[in-house]
Regions:
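Bacterial N-terminal signal peptides
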Residues: 1-11
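Noncatalytic, solvent-exposed loop/strand surfaces
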Residues: 13-420
C-alpha cells in the first residue's frame, strides 16, 4: 500500500515552477555545477551522514535531478548490468524513476524497451543509461539514444517520443538534453551527427543542424553581450555556435583538440569555456557572438591542459577541473588561461568520471570507486577532507546533484542522499 507521502506526490504531480533550490538538469540550473546553498556535509561514510540509501533496479551513469520533493533518475535492466552474465540484448530496458526526496522511496518506475538493433557490449562504466533527464516543472524529458527522446508527465505517463537518429557507437549514447523556452535541445552527434531542436510540448522537430562530430556532451547555452542566445557544442577540432531559434550555424572556432569532446562547456558573460580531448587534452575560452571562422578574432586563450570526461567549474574568475586519470586538479585564470595551480590530490579520489560540484565555497571531486575529495574553491589548493562510500570499491560514474543541504550521489547499485 502506498504511503501518505507517496500518495501526496502523485496527487500534486501536475506541474510546478522551478525553484532556486531545484536541480532540474545535468549539472543543475545553467549547467554550471554549482549551488549557492550551505550546509551540505563535508564528511560521510556508509554509516554516517547518510539520510537514506535506495537500491536501484539497475546501473547507470546518469545524474539525478530534483523538482520540489521529487527526484528523477534513469537506469537500465535486462542486459549487461554487471551482475552475472550479459543476458539477451532483446531484454534491454531503460527506466525513468521517480523517488521521494524525503525518504528515497521509489514512487514510480517507467520502463522503455530498447529499439533493436542496439549496440552490444557497451562497457559497464558507460552502459545504456548515461543521459541525465531534464524537467521544466511540468514534464520530464529523457534521451535514450536511438530508442528515442521521450517526454513524460510527472506521474510517469509517456506523452510523446521523437526519433533523432539511429547510428550506433561502441561507447553508447551519453548526451543530456537541455531546455530553452519551448525547445528541447538534443546533441545527437552519435545518432545522426546533428544538433536537434524539438518542440517540448509535442516532440515535433523544429530544426536540425548537421556536421556535429565526436561530441558527447549536453548543449551549452550562452547569451551574447547583445542579449542574443546561442547554443554551443564542442566537437572534434572545433567549437560551434548556432542560432537557438532556427539552428543556423553562426560561428566556429578551431581548438587544436583532435579527438572527441565529452565535458560540457560552461558559459558566463558571453564567453564559452571548454575543455576536452583524450590524448592530448586541451582547453580554451572563446567569445560568443561572432560570425564565420572566429579563431583569429574571438579566441581569448588556448592551453594544452584539459580533461577527457568531467566538466569544469567556473567560480570567481577561475576555472577548476580534474584530469580523469591522473588525480591532478587544475585552477586556471579564466581571463588569461594562465595556470594558477596544477597539483595532485592527496588523498587521491582515483579515476574521475563525475563532474565536480561547487557548494558553499567547496568543490567536491568524486572518484569512480566512491571516494570524494573536498577542496576549497580558491586559487590555492586547500584540501578540506575526504569521504568514502562502498569502501572505495563501487562504481560511481555519475555527477552528484545538490538538493538543499543534501548531496545526491548515485552508484551502479544505490542512490545516496547525504546530509542530516
Amino acid at each position: 500500500m502506498l504511503g501518505l507521502a507517496v500518495l501526496s506526490l502523485l496527487h500534486t504531480a501536475s506541474g510546478q515552477t522551478i525553484a532556486k533550490t531545484d536541480w532540474p538538469q545535468f549539472r543543475g540550473s545553467g549547467a554550471l555545477g554549482r549551488s549557492d546553498g550551505a550546509g551540505v556535509p563535508t564528511t560521510w561514510s556508509d554509516d554516517t551522514n547518510v539520510a537514506w540509501k535506495t537500491p536501484l533496479p539497475g546501473p547507470g551513469a546518469s545524474s539525478p535531478i530534483t523538482l520540489g520533493n521529487r527526484i528523477f533518475l534513469t537506469c537500465h535492466t535486462g542486459y549487461n548490468t554487471g551482475s552475472g552474465g550479459a543476458g539477451e540484448i532483446s531484454n534491454l530496458k531503460r527506466h525513468l524513476l521517480c523517488l521521494n526526496l524525503a525518504d528515497g522511496k521509489i514512487v514510480w518506475d517507467t520502463a522503455i524497451p530498447a529499439l533493436m538493433p542496439e549496440q552490444e557490449r557497451i562497457r559497464e562504466d558507460h552502459g545504456y543509461a548515461s543521459s541525465t533527464p531534464v524537467t521544466d516543472g511540468e514534464r520530464v524529458y529523457v534521451f535514450f539514444g536511438k530508442t528515442g527522446v521521450f517526454a513524460f508527465d510527472l506521474n510517469g505517463k509517456q506523452l510523446w517520443r521523437a526519433d533523432v537518429g539511429s547510428t550506433l557507437n561502441g561507447w553508447g549514447s551519453a548526451t543530456s538534453p537541455v531546455i530553452h523556452k519551448d525547445l528541447l535541445l538534443v546533441n545527437a552527434s552519435v545518432e545522426s551527427e546533428s544538433l536537434v531542436a524539438l518542440d517540448k510540448r509535442t516532440g515535433k522537430e523544429v530544426w536540425r543542424a548537421g556536421g556535429v562530430q565526436e561530441s558527447w556532451h549536453a548543449p551549452a547555452l550562452v547569451t551574447t553581450p547583445e542579449g542574443k542566445t546561442e547554443v554551443v557544442v564542442a566537437m572534434m577540432k572545433k567549437v560551434l555556435g548556432f542560432d537557438v531559434t532556427d539552428g543556423k550555424p553562426l560561428w566556429s572556432c578551431n581548438t587544436g583538440i583532435n579527438w572527441y569532446m565529452c565535458p560540457t562547456p560552461v558559459t558566463h558573460e558571453g564567453i564559452v569555456y571548454a575543455v576536452g580531448g583524450r590524448t592530448p587534452n586541451g582547453g580554451l575560452a572563446v567569445r560568443a557572438g561572432g560570425r564565420g571562422d572566429v579563431t583569429g578574432t574571438h579566441l581569448l586563450w588556448k592551453v594544452n591542459k584539459g580533461t577527457n570526461v568531467p566538466s569544469p567549474i567556473l567560480h570567481e574568475g577561475h576555472l577548476y577541473f580534474a584530469h580523469e586519470n591522473l588525480g591532478v586538479v587544475y585552477c586556471l585564470n579564466a581571463k588569461t588561461g594562465e595556470t594558477v595551480y596544477e597539483e595532485r590530490l592527496s588523498p587521491s579520489p582515483g579515476q574521475i568520471y563525475a563532474s565536480p560540484v561547487l557548494v558553499g565555497g567547496n568543490i567536491y571531486y568524486t572518484g569512480r570507486g566512491g571516494r570524494t575529495v573536498i577542496v576549497a574553491a580558491q586559487p590555492a589548493l586547500k584540501v578540506l577532507g575526504e569521504a568514502t562510500l562502498e569502501n572505495n570499491r563501487g562504481a560511481f560514474n555519475a555527477s552528484p546533484a545538490v538538493a538543499g543541504k543534501r548531496l545526491l550521489i548515485r552508484s551502479n547499485k544505490f542512490l545516496y542522499c547525504l546530509g542530516n
